């Protein structure tokens, strides 16, 4: 698997994400600039957390106009795998690559803590190394992680199996306890929890490693289940 992490001005999880993919999961991973317009060399493109362009206007609202986003839309339309984490999730919704939107947390506070998740769909490119119903603990760190969608969209997400991760104890008010969703075709995932911060036992746990192992399995056919 060859992956790329888009490093926007204000991204602060890009190096963590590259480390998780390259050093821990053992795949190739480049940092690329938001001016890049050709993504055809990659199997997976990752949009990291942080505060892209200072989160002015609202989270992700400016980043979506970067030249790389037009290339990312083409990449996704061609079937390439895209994952947006935290601010990356916000950017993907702003760009129209994922349904719904991220609002201010229910209590209007920034939340930074580990949270319990449940795996809802283990049949995606991002979750095939987990089991349905498996319980995970991943860190969150966001002020605008409250997932919102209209009733029709929520119904479609549930019917189509697009909800991949769900909060066990909803920390931010997200509708249907949604922590991570895919697009309708299943090749784009957005999630608020940070899997790249949960890949080393020394730092608190390895529950996030399965996200990257799943992508390796999907792109290379190399089943690495059990390595966690």
From Swiss-Prot:
Record Pfam families: GATase_5
GO terms assigned for molecular function: ATP binding; glutaminase activity; phosphoribosylformylglycinamidine synthase activity
Enzyme Commission number(s) of this protein: 6.3.5.3, 3.5.1.2
InterPro entries, per database record: Class_I_gatase-like, PRibForGlyAmidine_synth_PurQ
SUPFAM superfamilies, alphabetized: Class I glutamine amidotransferase-like (SSF52317)
Pathways involved: Purine metabolism; IMP biosynthesis via de novo pathway; 5-amino-1-(5-phospho-D-ribosyl)imidazole from N(2)-formyl-N(1)-(5-phospho-D-ribosyl)glycinamide: step 1/2
HAMAP family according to UniProt: PurQ
NCBIfam families: FGAM_synth_I, PRK03619.1
Protein name: Phosphoribosylformylglycinamidine synthase subunit PurQ
Lineage: Bacteria, Bacillati, Bacillota, Bacilli, Lactobacillales
């Amino acid at each position: 698997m060859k992956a790329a992490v888009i490093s926007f001005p204000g991204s602060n999880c890009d190096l963590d994400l590259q480390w998780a993919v390259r050093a821990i999961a053992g795949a190739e991973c480049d940092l690329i600039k938001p001016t890049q317009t050709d993504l055809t060399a990659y199997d997976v493109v990752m949009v990291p957390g942080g505060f892209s362009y200072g989160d002015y206007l609202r989270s992700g609202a400016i980043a979506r106009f970067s030249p790389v986003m037009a290339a990312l839309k083409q990449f996704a339309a061609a079937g390439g795998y895209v994952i947006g984490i935290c601010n990356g999730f916000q950017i993907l919704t702003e760009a129209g690559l994922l349904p719904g939107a991220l609002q201010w947390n229910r209590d209007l506070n920034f939340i930074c803590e580990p949270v319990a998740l449940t795996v809802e769909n283990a049949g995606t490119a991002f979750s095939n190394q987990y089991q349905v119903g498996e319980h995970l603990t991943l860190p969150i760190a966001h002020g605008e992680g409250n997932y919102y969608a209209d009733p029709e969209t929520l119904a479609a997400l549930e019917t189509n199996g697009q909800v991949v991760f769900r909060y066990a104890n909803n920390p931010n008010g997200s509708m249907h306890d949604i922590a991570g969703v895919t697009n309708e075709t299943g090749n784009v995932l957005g999630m608020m929890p940070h899997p790249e911060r949960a890949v080393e036992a020394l730092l608190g746990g390895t529950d996030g490693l399965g996200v990257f192992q799943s992508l390796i399995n999907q792109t290379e056919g190399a089943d690495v289940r059990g390595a966690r």
